[in-house]
């Protein structure tokens, strides 16, 4: 992270806000960055999403609440929140798509994104769920510090490049 980014973070930034359709290009860029740099962490692939039209990303923004961490240099982190639509599951929501650009890590941006999603959901749902790949110890610690507890282990949840990845299921 260059000095300007570091200064932005230490001076109270980033600004955490819900993304809108006007953020579709920035969202596409950070999403593809995550899929390329950390393919084991996402169910989708870079190859699946790189050729999707911008309208696909706009629609994704409108179908969920996606929080973004904004610095002067642009969008450096995202996390999605999606409430269940089925009547018997409307008391629950799913945290998904968490990603912070490598150069913006270790500055508490992930913590701020999770706090924003949890705060937003608190008046609307009773339970938040998420899945995190077992190897991602940093994310698992972040979620545990935010009050999430492990309740399950999904074996072979994802398969990428011939390798299986297990997920830890967490709830708050």
Predicted stretch roles:
Residues 1-22, 29, 33, 168:
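Conserved N-terminal entry element of GNAT/NAT acetyltransferase domains
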Residues 18-29, 33-103, 114-116, 120:
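Acetyl-CoA-dependent GNAT
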Residues 64-66, 165-169:
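Short hydrophobic/aromatic beta-strand or adjacent loop that forms the aromatic wall/cage
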Residues 74-77, 138, 164:
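Glycine-rich acetyl-CoA-binding "A-motif" of GNAT/NAT acetyltransferases
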Residues 107, 111, 135-153:
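Conserved active-site alpha-helix within GNAT-family acetyltransferase domains
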Residues 121-131:
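Conserved GNAT acetyl-CoA-binding A-motif
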Residues 129-133, 149-165:
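Conserved catalytic-core motifs of GNAT/GCN5-like acyltransferases
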């Amino acid at each position: 992270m260059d000095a300007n980014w570091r200064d932005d973070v230490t001076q109270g930034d980033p600004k955490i806000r819900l993304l809108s359709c006007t953020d579709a290009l920035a969202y596409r860029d950070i999403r593809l960055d995550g899929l390329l740099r950390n393919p084991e962490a996402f169910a989708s692939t870079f190859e699946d999403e790189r050729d999707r039209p911008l309208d696909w990303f706009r629609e994704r923004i409108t179908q969920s609440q996606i929080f973004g961490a904004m610095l002067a240099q642009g969008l450096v982190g995202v996390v999605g929140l999606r409430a269940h639509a089925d009547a018997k599951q409307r008391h629950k929501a799913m945290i998904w798509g968490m990603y912070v650009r490598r150069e913006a890590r270790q500055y508490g941006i992930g913590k701020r994104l999770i706090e924003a999603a949890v705060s937003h959901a608190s008046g609307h749902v009773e339970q938040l769920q998420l899945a995190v790949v077992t190897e991602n110890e940093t994310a698992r610690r972040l979620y545990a510090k935010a009050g999430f507890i492990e309740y399950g282990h999904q074996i072979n949840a994802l398969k990428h490049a011939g390798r299986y990845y297990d997920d830890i299921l967490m709830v708050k």
